């Protein structure tokens, strides 16, 4: 039996509020994270992802509080990322009620962190978040044509995005959260070529993110190899509902969780 496709709203949280911009800039307030999380749970979201975009020390304590409050009200799996640098950070988030933790920049600086986390907490708890973009003109060429970026897509990490996903799998992560920085907030559809290339390179689940603008954008991402589809602003501002996305996915011949 095919595994049901997961539909995941993503909430970027800054100082205890949900924010959304294009390519992480021009952030607009999109509401209270716990209220939004409860709404998405009621609307049929399969999971939720919180990304802490404040990632300062003050922001950290606030984020743990948001996770605690959310876990009290919401009973679907919760992934939390942003500023995760150590096993201690992961331990705190899991104790607060997160089910999974996504790791990004800190793993680029120290890849063995992924192995440490996977061995200590289990692969199912560790998500590698890859902020990928097409190599810009004049950039360092990469075999796949896609590079890993840091700092909200503004800096190149100088490594190939597809090879980095493969390395993450080899180091024991359970999923890849693949975010197209070219697509982030643009609503022009997912980067299907990026999804295909990563899908062919890894056997663990791939969550596609970046570019969703309408319900019809989701089935092509699944056809390209995504096991789960993630979006943010179209859900927060009420442009698209989770049930509309699921209807499109079912109409295209895929299974969803009812």
UniProtKB/Swiss-Prot annotation:
Keyword line: Amino-acid biosynthesis, Cytoplasm, Histidine biosynthesis, Lyase
EC number annotated for this UniProt entry: 4.3.2.10
Pfam families listed in its UniProt record: His_biosynth (PF00977)
SUPFAM superfamilies: Ribulose-phoshate binding barrel
One GO CC term, this protein: cytoplasm
Enzyme active site: 12, 131
Single GO MF annotation: lyase activity
GO biological process: L-histidine biosynthetic process
Pathway: Amino-acid biosynthesis; L-histidine biosynthesis; L-histidine from 5-phospho-alpha-D-ribose 1-diphosphate: step 5/9
Enzyme class, first EC level, given as a word: lyase
Catalysed reaction equations from the record: 5-[(5-phospho-1-deoxy-D-ribulos-1-ylimino)methylamino]-1-(5-phospho-beta-D-ribosyl)imidazole-4-carboxamide + L-glutamine = D-erythro-1-(imidazol-4-yl)glycerol 3-phosphate + 5-amino-1-(5-phospho-beta-D-ribosyl)imidazole-4-carboxamide + L-glutamate + H(+)
Biological role: IGPS catalyzes the conversion of PRFAR and glutamine to IGP, AICAR and glutamate. The HisF subunit catalyzes the cyclization activity that produces IGP and AICAR from PRFAR using the ammonia provided by the HisH subunit.
Subunit annotation: Heterodimer of HisH and HisF.
PANTHER family the UniProt entry points to: IMIDAZOLE GLYCEROL PHOSPHATE SYNTHASE HISHF (PTHR21235:SF2), IMIDAZOLE GLYCEROL PHOSPHATE SYNTHASE SUBUNIT HISF/H IGP SYNTHASE SUBUNIT HISF/H (PTHR21235)
Protein family: Belongs to the HisA/HisF family.
Protein name: Imidazole glycerol phosphate synthase subunit HisF
Source organism: Corynebacterium diphtheriae (strain ATCC 700971 / NCTC 13129 / Biotype gravis)
């Amino acid at each position: 039996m095919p595994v049901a496709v997961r539909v995941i709203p993503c909430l970027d949280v800054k100082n205890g509020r949900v924010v959304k911009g294009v390519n992480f800039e021009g952030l607009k307030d999109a509401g209270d994270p716990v209220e939004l999380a409860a709404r998405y749970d009621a609307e049929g979201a399969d999971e939720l992802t919180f990304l802490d975009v404040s990632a300062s020390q003050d922001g950290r304590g606030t984020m743990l509080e948001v996770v605690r409050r959310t876990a009290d009200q919401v009973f679907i799996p919760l992934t939390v990322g942003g500023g995760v640098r150590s096993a201690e950070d992961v331990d705190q988030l899991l104790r607060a009620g997160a089910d999974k933790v996504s790791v990004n920049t800190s793993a680029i600086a120290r890849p063995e962190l992924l192995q440490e986390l996977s061995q200590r907490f289990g692969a199912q708890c560790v998500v590698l978040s890859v902020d990928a973009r097409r190599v810009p003109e004049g950039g360092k060429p990469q075999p796949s044509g896609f590079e890993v970026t840091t700092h909200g897509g503004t800096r190149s990490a100088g490594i190939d995005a597809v090879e980095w996903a493969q390395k993450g799998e080899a180091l024991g992560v359970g999923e890849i959260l693949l975010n197209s920085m070219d697509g982030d907030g643009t609503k022009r559809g997912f980067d299907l070529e990026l999804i295909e290339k990563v899908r062919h390179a890894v056997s663990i689940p791939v969550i596609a993110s970046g570019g969703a603008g309408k319900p019809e954008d989701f089935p092509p991402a699944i056809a390209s190899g995504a096991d789960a589809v993630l979006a943010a602003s179209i859900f927060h501002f009420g442009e698209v509902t989770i049930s509309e996305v699921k209807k499109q996915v079912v109409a295209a011949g895929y299974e969803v969780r009812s």
